[in-house]
């Protein structure tokens, strides 16, 4: 069975891993980095992903960041003169990760396990699966990020029984999961979180502070200047990271804008104490989900054996202190918070292929599921933290006499009224025979698969007629749209490959011209004019083809030059070999003379 890669598709950074033997290994990107910025740029018709895209974010307005926060919505982003869905942008990131994983493995990759925040709803999970499909990946499993982290942490501890709390604060989302580990079973007991809390929010607090201070001093609002704002974002992220290691950092942004008197510079120092003060409310927001998860799991703090930190934002000292204060435990630092999720996803890939034995993953649904009933009430069929996959049925009836149809309004959430929860979809069961109110028996069945994706069936028990749908939110993509996007992605991949081929050819031409000119110069006056003239002629023809920019012509002329240059090199080699042989002959003669002299022995004659 071909390899299944594990992908952590993050808000700010992503990572890809693969199982090698029994070890999960992070695959470094072409720049040698173990994580890749989740950034996409468009320039001159080219799609740029990762570190290169992040570097040009300041100067290139066609740059998309933190697209994960829009997954599961109908919100599109404008770039490159087009509008893109969040799924398409995410697919570009996935395609890039897939590409360098293939380069590392030396084989095609067609399957992946992709992680999502535990608190992602059905629409967000479906959007992630669609992004994988657009990128040319068969998504074998959607796994919750904290669960994947627990897999990576617990793989070498399958003989131990312990309860762990995973505290996952990423770039844009926050999750807390409580798991029980024992005998190779990873059982998620409860999960809670906040999809609108992450490292980006900590950066924003610094940005807001810098903007306010600069406005106070100079009367100019930097938040209205796109380029200045991007520079502020980069500076804020760097300052946040610096303050994890030092107690004070300097923020220096020369020529940030211009005033009436000329250019203005931003020079400011930020202390860790000030940063903690600015972000106090964000740190406070992490506490409620911790308490919620513990309550749902029915556990006290004393029953938690280990606390695992996941996500780059858990390096913030105030966050670490808050975790210690809330759990009463020193966090376990045996895992890399940036890499552990992708590693866990790769392990789950190994479970699917059978390379990892005796491991069972029991995940849960993060939010309750149900339907709207009379009076706009939300009636739950499946409670949050139910182990998945699962199925649950309940019988309902009509609300009016002779009602010919029922509308099934499917919802996800925890609020008592339907209007306050997330609509997953609507469908209708028709042709119900005329009968007094309350007589028809309508059975509604919810199914949640191992990926947390929902399907709903409504059945009239009297007529056995049923209506079945896999939930597709209003913000979801149709199969036709996914197919079109897949074709676009494939076309882009072909265009990118062609562009790379062009660049490689041009580099090869430059190298050949340089090497041949050097050889011609070195062989001047050494007696092989025929070969030198042929190489010079081929060189001139290649230069002319290079000037014209005709790739086919360049390729043909490059082959011709290589042939002539090789002939010249052979002559040079023959001459050098002959010279060496002659030199060895001279040395041999001298050695013989020396040997002959050695045969004469000096002796002493003693007269007696």
Curated annotation (Swiss-Prot):
HAMAP family: DnaK. Residues 599-608 have a biased composition (Acidic residues). Gene3D superfamilies: 1.20.1270.10, 3.30.420.40, Actin, Chain A, domain 4 (3.90.640.10), Substrate Binding Domain Of DNAk, Chain A, domain 1 (2.60.34.10). Residues 578-608 are annotated as: Disordered. Belongs to the heat shock protein 70 family. Acts as a chaperone. The keyword ATP-binding applies. This is Chaperone protein DnaK. It comes from Streptococcus pyogenes serotype M3 (strain ATCC BAA-595 / MGAS315). It holds the Pfam family HSP70. CDD domains: ASKHA_NBD_HSP70_DnaK-like. The gene is dnaK. Residues 578-598 have a biased composition (Low complexity). Induction: By stress conditions e.g. heat shock. The modification Phosphothreonine is found at residue 173.
């Amino acid at each position: 069975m071909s390899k299944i890669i594990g992908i952590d598709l993050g808000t700010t950074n992503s990572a890809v891993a693969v199982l090698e033997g029994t070890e999960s290994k992070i695959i470094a990107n072409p720049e040698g980095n173990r994580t890749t910025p989740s950034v996409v740029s468009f320039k001159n018709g080219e799609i740029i992903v990762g570190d290169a895209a992040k570097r040009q974010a300041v100067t290139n307005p066609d740059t998309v960041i933190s697209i994960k926060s829009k997954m599961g919505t109908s919100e599109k982003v404008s770039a490159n003169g087009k509008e893109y869905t969040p799924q398409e942008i995410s697919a570009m990131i996935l395609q890039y990760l897939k590409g360098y994983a293939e380069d590392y493995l030396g084989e095609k990759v067609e399957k992946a396990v992709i992680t999502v925040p535990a608190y992602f709803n059905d629409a967000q999970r479906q959007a992630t699966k669609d992004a994988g499909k657009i990128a040319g990946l068969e998504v074998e499993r959607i796994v919750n990020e904290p669960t994947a982290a627990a897999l990576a942490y617990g793989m070498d501890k399958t003989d131990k029984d312990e309860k762990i709390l995973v505290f996952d604060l990423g770039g844009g989302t926050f999750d807390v999961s409580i798991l029980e580990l024992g005998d190779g079973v990873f059982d998620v007991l409860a999960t809670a979180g906040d999809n609108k809390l992450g490292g980006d929010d900590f950066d924003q607090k610094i940005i807001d502070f810098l903007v306010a201070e600069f406005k106070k001093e100079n009367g100019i609002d930097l938040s209205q200047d796109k380029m200045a704002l991007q520079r502020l974002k980069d500076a804020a992220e760097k300052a946040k990271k610096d303050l994890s290691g030092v107690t004070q950092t300097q923020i220096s942004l020369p020529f940030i804008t211009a005033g009436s008197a000329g250019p203005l510079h931003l020079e400011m120092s930020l202390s860790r104490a000030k940063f903690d003060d600015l972000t106090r409310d964000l740190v406070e927001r992490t506490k409620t989900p911790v308490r919620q998860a513990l309550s749902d799991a029915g556990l006290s703090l004393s029953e938690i054996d280990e606390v695992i930190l996941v996500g780059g934002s858990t390096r913030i000292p105030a966050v670490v202190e808050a975790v210690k204060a809330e759990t009463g435990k020193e966090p376990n630092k045996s895992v890399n918070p940036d890499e552990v999720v992708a590693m866990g996803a790769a392990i789950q890939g190994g479970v699917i292929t059978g390379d990892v034995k005796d491991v069972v993953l029991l995940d849960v649904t993060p939010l309750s599921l149900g339907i709207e009933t009379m009076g706009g009430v939300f009636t739950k069929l499946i409670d949050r933290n139910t182990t998945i996959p699962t199925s649950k049925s309940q019988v309902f009836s009509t609300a009016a006499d002779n009602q010919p149809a029922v509308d099934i309004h499917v919802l996800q959430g925890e609020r008592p009224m339907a209007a306050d929860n997330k609509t997953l979809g609507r469908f209708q069961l028709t042709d119900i025979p005329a009968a007094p109110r309350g007589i028809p028996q309508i059975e509604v069945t919810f199914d949640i698969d191992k990926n947390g994706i929902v399907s709903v069936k409504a059945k009239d028990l009297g007529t056995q007629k049923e209506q079945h749908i896999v939930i597709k939110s209003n913000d979801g993509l149709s199969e036709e749209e996914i197919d079109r996007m897949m074709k676009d992605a494939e076309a882009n991949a072909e265009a990118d490959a062609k562009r790379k081929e062009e660049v490689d050819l041009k580099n090869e031409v430059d190298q050949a011209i340089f090497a041949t000119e050097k050889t011609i110069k070195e062989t001047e006056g050494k007696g092989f004019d025929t070969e030198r003239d042929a190489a010079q002629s081929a060189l001139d023809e290649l230069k002319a083809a290079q000037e014209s920019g005709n790739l086919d012509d360049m390729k043909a002329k490059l082959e011709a030059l290589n042939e002539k240059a090789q002939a010249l090199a052979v002559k040079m080699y023959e001459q050098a070999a002959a010279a060496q042989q002659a030199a060895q002959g001279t040395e041999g003669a001298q050695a013989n003379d020396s040997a002959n002299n050695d045969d004469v022995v000096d002796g002493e004659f003693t007269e007696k």
